[in-house]
């Protein structure tokens, strides 16, 4: 369900409704348990652009995939501005967590990053800084056949749009796995989980 409204309408960027609804970057929406299926309501703002709509979808994906991979703590950490940089030093990353790595939280191990953090970002929404970074983000285009060891190469903001929100988010979404099969009991078509939350166990 897509809703469009003006500023201060109070919409969540995305919120889930229905029986068994869970957090999806907002909500869950109360009073909807009588609906037998889960569905997500997207709340868009007429004052914002397509880039922000893609950002809303990206956060929906992050939240739901974090639940699939049991990585809610990791997602919270990745967005915590007061994070302890050493907190992940001994962590064995699952595939979702590895996808989300950016240089600030995993120096030398940058993958695709998050919706707010490109592989070289130092802070939220910093998609255009010129600092080069070693990243294996393009390995994700080969999923599930991720190279071992990863193919780290030098990337810059030019690779994901030079600071353009829409270009970065399209780049990020294009690397989310979307192929047949399963790995460790989780579908290789990650999109199915955040497009249809009824597929989330």
State each model region's role.
Residues 42, 48, 160-162:
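Surface-exposed extracytoplasmic segments
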Residues 22-46, 171:
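Flexible, surface-exposed loop/gating regions in the mature catalytic domains
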Residues 47-68:
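Active-site recognition of the HExxH zinc-binding catalytic motif
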Residues 10-14, 61-62, 69-70:
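Short catalytic/ligand-binding loop motif for oxyanion handling, primarily in non-cytosolic enzymes
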Residues 25, 53-57, 181-184, 192:
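Acidic, proline/glycine-rich low-complexity IDRs
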Residues 1-26:
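Active-site-proximal segments of metallohydrolase catalytic domains
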Residues 4-8, 43-45, 63:
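Active-site-proximal beta-strand/loop segments in catalytic clefts of secreted hydrolases
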């Amino acid at each position: 369900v897509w809703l469009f409204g003006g500023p201060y309408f109070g919409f969540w960027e995305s919120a889930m409704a229905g029986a068994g609804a869970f957090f999806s970057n907002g909500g869950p929406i109360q009073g909807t348990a009588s609906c037998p299926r889960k569905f997500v309501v997207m709340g868009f703002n007429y004052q914002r652009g397509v880039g922000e709509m893609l950002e809303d979808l990206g956060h929906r994906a992050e939240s739901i995939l974090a639940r699939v991979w049991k990585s809610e703590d990791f997602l919270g950490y990745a967005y915590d501005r007061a994070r302890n940089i050493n907190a992940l030093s001994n962590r064995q990353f699952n595939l979702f967590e590895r996808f989300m790595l950016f240089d600030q939280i995993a120096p030398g191990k940058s993958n695709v990053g998050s919706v707010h953090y490109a592989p070289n970002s130092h802070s939220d929404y910093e998609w255009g800084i010129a600092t080069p970074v070693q990243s294996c983000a393009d390995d994700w285009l080969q999923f599930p056949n991720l190279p071992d060891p990863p193919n780290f190469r030098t990337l810059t903001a030019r690779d994901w749009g030079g600071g353009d929100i829409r270009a970065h988010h399209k780049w990020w979404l294009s690397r989310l796995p979307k192929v047949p099969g399963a790995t460790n009991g989780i579908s290789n078509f990650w999109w199915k989980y955040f497009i249809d939350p009824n597929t989330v166990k």
